[in-house]
């Protein structure tokens, strides 16, 4: 287990005193009443929330540790205080119903009187004036208009829009003194949840704290069940769900890419790339308007059969003339031999040719074959990305297969169209259009 702030106790639940702690009622009381003996990650979550130095707690914790269980228990404890508002944000309807049932079960178990219960809007108002609300990250607007004391993001990383939902809609609702937010999840690669997790290690953000735990930190975990899962699920899924590993995730397209092997500082190799006879220089272009237009400059080395990505460009809502100016810059700087553009962007190619005298060819379009080609090249170490191409690196790490609407089932028929698509498409257009087996 790892905690970003070393002073956070992971062995014993600490009482910070009624004047300083977050929960007015002692956490030890609800733990004893419920017969809960918390494990290390659960203790860390409790103490991190109780500590007045923290407002935002990010817990990247694997399955079989009880992160959601302890979070909902703490949310219920907060509701026992008068005139408190607790919001739980869930990524989908299924998880929302689980949380709703857990809170309702605790309210019923302790015989709390309710003034209002709205199953449709997922709201419960208690007789003490406290309110529990459950919302989805995709519809965070439904939760604004109130000031919350405690916001819990359950399985936060599952929703791609959770980060924006918090930054734009929900963080302004934490305007009460000592209001806090808890983000709990298994990871999903390098999305916004990883960014929030990194905040806890930033010394300039002392009110953030991060916790990492796996099934090994739960002494009550069934190791036989864990080993059966290891044998029956994919390697990436096991590392994601049971190791809480940010570096891989189920559905990751370029799981053969890793920054250690495939990202290099190529600035010191300029003399190497100046040998025009040894290289072919390519541009791969994915065209968009509201979506960004992405351009990658790629050097293909004949002798080693290796592709070097030297420069990236990604701009939205620009004119063809503005994109053409950048493309001409690349042509002049890198002596570009061939330009491959999304075959669906015929008008863009025509405008480049007739208005800017830039010739291009339609890229090979087969998506699955092109992705398989790139996967194999990464596996063979045949694609190297310059360290300055930070957006491409992020895209490669987070590009994933699409999910069917409302399901966890992956579709491997097509990639998900999101912010990671554009540079990955440009890479595919540039490389697959000249690759082996053409």
UniProtKB/Swiss-Prot annotation:
GO aspect biological process, one term: viral DNA genome packaging
Molecular-function GO terms, alphabetical: ATP binding; ATP hydrolysis activity; endonuclease activity; metal ion binding; nuclease activity
Keywords associated with the record: ATP-binding, Endonuclease, Hydrolase, Magnesium, Metal-binding, Nuclease, Nucleotide-binding, Viral genome packaging, Viral release from host cell
Residues at the active site: 155 (for atpase activity)
Binding residues annotated for Mg(2+) 1, in chain numbering: 286, 418
Binding residue positions for Mg(2+) 2: 286, 342
UniProt motif (Walker A motif) ranges: 62-68
UniProt-reported outcome of changing residue 425 to N: 50% loss of endonuclease activity
Motif Walker B motif, chain ranges: 150-155
Cofactor, free-text remark: ATPase activity requires 1 Mg(2+) ion per subunit. Nuclease activity probably requires 2 Mg(2+) ions per subunit.
Impact upon substituting residue 286 to N: 50% loss of endonuclease activity
A GO cellular-component term linked to this record: viral terminase, large subunit
Induction / repression: Expressed in the late phase of the viral replicative cycle.
Major enzyme class: hydrolase
Cofactors required: Mg(2+)
EC number: 3.6.4.-, 3.1.21.-
Assembly behavior: Interacts with the terminase small subunit; the active complex is probably heterooligomeric. Interacts with the portal protein.
Function noted in UniProt: The terminase large subunit acts as an ATP driven molecular motor necessary for viral DNA translocation into empty capsids and as an endonuclease that cuts the viral genome to initiate and to end a packaging reaction The terminase lies at a unique vertex of the procapsid and is composed of two subunits, a small terminase subunit involved in viral DNA recognition (packaging sequence), and a large terminase subunit possessing endonucleolytic and ATPase activities. Both terminase subunits heterooligomerize and are docked on the portal protein to form the packaging machine.
Comment on protein domains: The N-terminus contains an ATPase domain. The C-terminus contains an endonuclease domain.
Protein name: Terminase, large subunit
